[in-house]
Structures are given as structure tokens and as C-alpha cells.
Amino acid sequence: TARDAGVGFILEAPTWRANPDWGAKLGYSPEALDAINLDAVALMEEMRGEFEMPETPMVISGQIGPRGDGYDPGEIMSVEEAQAYHDRQIAVFARTNADMITALTITNTAEAIGITKAAQAAAMPVVIGFTVETDGCLPTGQTLADAIKEVDDATASGPIYYMVNCAHPSHFEDKLADGGDWKNRLR
């Protein structure tokens, strides 16, 4: 565990699909989704209270998933649509003791930019986790380097960092061998 290793830990609220489209498929109202998001962060607060030590700090993250499939960009929203879509969930997290927002399995830059802008409007630090295919590119075909640059350019380097998730390291390790400052944005 993190405590045994003497390192910090990010507690991700289990809210990846607690957003409007996915909630509606399960019959949840917007208010019920708000309560789910609030309760999930409260659970992370309990865990932090029980397990955090001075030498092993714990950060609580409100987790955001993509609007659609995390591996297929499907119909891509505009930046404005993405910001409006994710705004409510992010605003709920901003009312809690969540320390940051983490968006996982994001397939395209328009959604990443919209999420970042919604987080900026709520004064919440945000992390963008892109999905990449076996060629190391986003499902849209865009390179990871170009995606990071596009999001940074559109948001004044808004994300505190980027990550790649749900991909085997062999899918993108050759991309990391290429030069470029964009790699410094990955954690």
C-alpha cells in the first residue's frame, strides 16, 4: 500500500459514469447524480481520514468519464458543448473537499478542452487522461504530443498534468522516445 511504501496516494471518487447521459440510462435524475457525486467524495474523505499519515498525503479526486465510449470518439462535441455537458458534475465536486478533477479515457481534444474550461470556471485543478490506441495515437488519429499541445494552447496550459490510461505501455513507449517538451506534461 501507499502507506507501507511511504508515498502519497490519489483517492479517485468512483464517479466515472456519474454524468447526465449515463445517469439517464439508469433512470437517475440530475439531482440524484449530484447526490451520488457528493456521496462518493464523502466516502473518499472517510478513507483519507482513516488512512492518511503526514508522510503519506492523500489527495481526493472527483473522477470524470467521457460523454461517450472511452475508446471510440463517436460524434465529437464542440468545446462549448463539452464544457456545458461536464459543468454540473465539476461544479458539484467544487462544493466538496475534492482537491482536483481527473478526466479519464478522454478520446478527443474538444472534450478535453471543454472539461478543462469547466474546471477552470469552478477553480478546480484538473488532470486529463487520454486514451491511446496501439499506435500511440488518440482514437481520433491525433498524436499524443499534438493533443497535449492543442489543449494547452486552448486553455493556457490549464491541466496540472496529463496522463495516459487504459493502454499498455508498449502502445506509446516509442512516442516517448521522440523529443519534445510535451513529455514534461505527462505524469
How does the language model describe each region?
Residues 1-187:
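Domain-level signal for soluble alpha/beta catalytic cores
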